[in-house]
Amino acid sequence: MKLKYCGLHQQEDVEVAAASHCDYMGFVLANSKRKVALPDVAQWLATTDMSTKQTVALFVNESLDTIAQVASSDLFDVIQLHGTETPAFLQAVKDRTQKQVWKAIHHSSSALGIMQAFAGIADGYVIDCKSAKGWGGTGESFDWKQIPSYKEEGVRQGTQVLIAGGITPENVVELARYQVDGLDVSSGIEENGKKSVAKIARLEQEAGVHYARNNTR
C-alpha cells in the first residue's frame, strides 16, 4: 500500500514527510490555504533527503502552459489534475511534460464513468470526496463502501487507485478490509496547520498493522 502525504506547505512539513514512510509528497499549486510557491519548494527540497520519495504537483483547472512551466523545473515526478480536466487535456499534459499524470475524481454517481473515460490515458487515480468546501483537503470522506468499484476499474485499466478524503489515524482501520492501492492524506495528519509527527506515526502504525493482518487472511 502506497502513502501520499499532500498539502505540504512549509519546510517543517517537508522534513516531517521525508522522515516518514510515505511514498509520495504532494504540493498544492492551486488556490488553497496550502498553496505553495515554486521557489519555496525548490529551497525545501534542496535541503531534504528525497532519495526514497516521489514528489507530486497538484493543479486544479490550470493552463497547459503553466503546468508545463512547473514541470520543466524538474522538482516533481508526478502531475496530479484535481479539477474538471478532460481526457484530451490530460493527454496533452503527458505529451508536453513527459511526466506521469494522475487524475483526481470526486466520488459521485457518475464518477466511475468519468474514470472509464480516462482509461489508457491516466497513469493513476485519486478518488476524493466531492465537497462544497473545496476541491480537496477538506477532511470530508465519501461512502467507502463504493471503493471496490473503483478498485475493479483500476485493475481493469492496470493503474493504481489512491483513496483520499477524511482519512485520519482514527478511521484508517476502516479502510483495511478494502486493501486499497494507496491512501492520500492531508488534513488528517495535521495539527495547528502543520503536519504532525505524532499523527503520522499513529496513522502509519494503524495502517501497517491492520493491512498486514488483512493480507494474511
Curated annotation (Swiss-Prot):
Instruction: Quote the catalytic activity from the record.
Output: N-(5-phospho-beta-D-ribosyl)anthranilate = 1-(2-carboxyphenylamino)-1-deoxy-D-ribulose 5-phosphate
* GO BP terms in the entry: L-tryptophan biosynthetic process
Q: What is the E.C. number? A: 5.3.1.24
Pathway, per record: Amino-acid biosynthesis; L-tryptophan biosynthesis; L-tryptophan from chorismate: step 3/5
What is the top EC class of this enzyme, as a single word?
A: isomerase
Check the record and name the SUPFAM superfamilies matching this protein. Answer: Ribulose-phoshate binding barrel
| GO molecular-function terms, A-Z | phosphoribosylanthranilate isomerase activity
Q: Which CDD domains match?
A: PRAI (cd00405)
Q: Which UniProt keywords apply?
A: Amino-acid biosynthesis, Aromatic amino acid biosynthesis, Isomerase, Tryptophan biosynthesis
**Xref: HAMAP family:** PRAI
Q: Which family does it belong to?
A: Belongs to the TrpF family.
Full protein name: N-(5'-phosphoribosyl)anthranilate isomerase
Q: Which organism is it from?
A: Shouchella clausii (strain KSM-K16) (Alkalihalobacillus clausii)
